[in-house]
Amino acid sequence: LFDRFIDFSKPDFVGREAYLRKRDQAPAAILCTLTVDDNTSTSGVKRYMLGREPIMTPDLDPIVDAHGRRSFVTSAGSAPSLGKHVLMSYLPPEHAIEGTKLIVEYLGDHYPVTVAVAGATPLFDPKNERILS
């Protein structure tokens, strides 16, 4: 994950042993980008999540990682270039699969979302072609 920032040609540095141990372990949660499939409430009002909303399975079961932490929306915002409302969240590996359908609870209603990206790749211009042109 951070290997590109670490110079392993140096004989030793503070934290090297801990980093090498952690590097080989599977992560408890993966940063994911979610897109809101339908943000219309049961009363017909368009709702836009802001962050801190719980994320659940389609069966409304809470999503919990290997350390017992629940998955929540960490940040949210409108993506005009994509025409969607986008959410960020840390999800356990078994849910961090592109195309996975999940539910976000917001103001007492449940909204369908889809895992669009698992990892730190952006949704818009993932290869930086637009900025490099």
Where are these predicted regions, by residue range?
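Conserved, structured C-terminal
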Residues: L1-S133
